[in-house]
Curated annotation (Swiss-Prot):
Function per UniProt: Catalyzes the GTP-dependent ribosomal translocation step during translation elongation. During this step, the ribosome changes from the pre-translocational (PRE) to the post-translocational (POST) state as the newly formed A-site-bound peptidyl-tRNA and P-site-bound deacylated tRNA move to the P and E sites, respectively. Catalyzes the coordinated movement of the two tRNA molecules, the mRNA and conformational changes in the ribosome.
Compartment(s) where it occurs, according to its Swiss-Prot or TrEMBL record: Cytoplasm
Keyword field contains Iron-sulfur: no
Organism from which the protein derives: Citrifermentans bemidjiense (strain ATCC BAA-1014 / DSM 16622 / JCM 12645 / Bem)
NCBIfam families, A to Z: EF-G, PRK12740.1-3, PRK12740.1-5, PRK13351.1-1, small_GTP
Positions contributing to GTP binding: 17-24, 81-85, 135-138
Classification via SUPFAM superfamilies: EF-G C-terminal domain-like, P-loop containing nucleoside triphosphate hydrolases, Ribosomal protein S5 domain 2-like, Translation proteins
One MF annotation (Gene Ontology) recorded for this entry: translation elongation factor activity
Protein name: Elongation factor G
Predominant localisation class: cytoplasm
Gene expressing this chain: fusA
InterPro entries in UniProt: EFG_II (IPR041095), EFG_III (IPR009022), EFG_III/V (IPR035647), EFG_IV (IPR047872), EFG_V (IPR035649), EFG_V-like (IPR000640), EFTu-like_2 (IPR004161), G_TR_CS (IPR031157)
Amino acid sequence: MARQVSLEMTRNIGIMAHIDAGKTTTTERILYYTGVSHKIGEVHDGAATMDWMEQEQERGITITSAATTCNWRDHRINIIDTPGHVDFTIEVERSLRVLDGAVAVFCSVGGVEPQSETVWRQADKYRVPRIAFINKMDRVGADFFRGIAMIKDRLKANPVPLQIPIGSEENYKGLVDLIEMKGIVFNDESMGATFDTIEIPADLLEQAQEYREALIEEVSSHDDVLMEKYLGGEEISNAELKAAIRQATLDIKICPVICGSAFKNKGVQHLLDAVLDYMPAPTDIPAIQGVDANTDAPIERHASDSEPFAALGFKIMTDPFVGQLCFFRVYSGVIQSGSYVYNATKGKRERIGRILKMHANKREEIKEVYAGDIAAAVGLKYTTTGDTLCAEDHAVILESIEFPEPVISIAIEPKTKADQEKLGLSLGKLASEDPSFRVKTDEETGQTIISGMGELHLEIIVDRLFREFKVEANVGKPQVAYRETITKKVKAEGKFVRQSGGRGQFGHVWLEVEPQEAGKGYEFVDAIKGGVVPREYIPAVDKGIKEALDNGVMAGFPVVDIKVTLVDGSYHEVDSSEMAFKIAGSMGFKEGCQKASPIILEPIMSVEVVVPEEYMGDVIGDLNSRRGRIMGMEGRAGAQVVASMVPLAQMFGYSTDLRSATQGRATYSMTFDHYEPVPKSVAEEIVAKVKG
């Protein structure tokens, strides 16, 4: 089967935006116009084709980015729908990694919303060219020009309108195309599928000319040939103008802006045209960088069928019908179904059983995939998100996707004994789909602890356990791992004597217990002189102390950073035993800890908040109220970055509180930094709670 669509006629794009800007609806309309779905799915009635997990249809938000293929004007467009919620930024991050261009959807009423800032920063990081689509032009309060001003001010981008609207709110009829200088009016009867080209309405003519002039001026400032023509007063043809807009967009010098109302089916066809005209083909983007899997030498892979096969797995999904699917983007070469590939990241050979082209939730089986395309493979056993698949004789590791560390943990336990085994398996499956979700067993409590990117993230995981795997689970409150240590050097005695007829028990030790610097751990020193404690019993003393370390004297937390020296003791010829000295060691250690002013230590997190100027005071006040210490502030791209140290115990519920305090415009990252002593009043509370 030869290649059906040339590389130059392929587009891999993402649709990104704030929660309610109308992303999924826009994607739905694109699928409708490109002839893929015959009935338009409305998000409002929970039937959108892109939102195919049950939770998404209920909540009306998009969680998983389904990759969909459609055709327009003989081109092939692969669309990745991405979620707009802070807790799912991992999904956005992983989809931006594999697409070439993006359509940023903005609501004409809300303009640039908080999440748009986060997503925009992520797109800047991966240098993704963008087109802005100002949606919902028919809503009350719609303002196209304010939307453009906000893109400039808040996102520090360079928006260049290619259209201006004809009317707005309920009078929104169509648009003026500034390149062709024609008016376009949509027919309501045909659901906007047909439109008439008209002369520009007289009242808009002057404004249209101004904007066209501004468009030519901006574009020619990035193109020397056009600049000469423009300054020389020569006519610039539409084809030249389009080519220059395309180049400036690919270089991320400008962001073309168009308008419409996806829900009312207006402007979607022009959005598709703009994607073909101004978004990059796989051949327009730089070759992908990687390293040779054997020698670590840098390698490039160009978008070409003749180069060795290389692809990046960017999403694992469990499909109810075919099992585990791995979505992958082919950067170079060709792969057939049934063939073997090499997973260079894991060093394993894999067989691709079947290859599917996904359309939202319908699937078409294909025999092979070419460079520049996106498809899903069935049958990969070891591959997880971010792994490189390649030809075994040309093994390469492509730059992987960076995943943030989870910031919130809760204990989870099955409701019934029968669910116990299923819980482990199901959590394992979910963790392979989502690298920002981790599962571990707490050695101290034996509980299963799950960690993720936020409270909503974990809520949805627990929800999926029930829906997809039929496992019912109870979740606990978020937990903090406290520790204990001592603050002064003391000498303590441990004596274990039992005489009650027959053979007794006798063990007696003197210990010096002292604090060590943080991170040193436990150290045992044998300083016995003259055999007052026989050689063979000394390891038993050490063992007894080690066992006592697990349960501190204040609240039963593990004891850390402590040095114990065995200085003296005595023994009994008949009654002494290893057992007796082990108990004596443990008793002496506990006695010593009681006397050595013990304290509780808590984990301190390094918290960085990126916040717009106007919310700065609120954010700092809130961090202070959480016992936080502000370490510094700096300006960064129109926002302030506040660095602080905050106890983990005070950070629960923070993502929700921060979101409401800043209308979701602030983002934060949190990593473990060190342990430090808990203030006395807090320590008393912790002890009271444990002893409860």
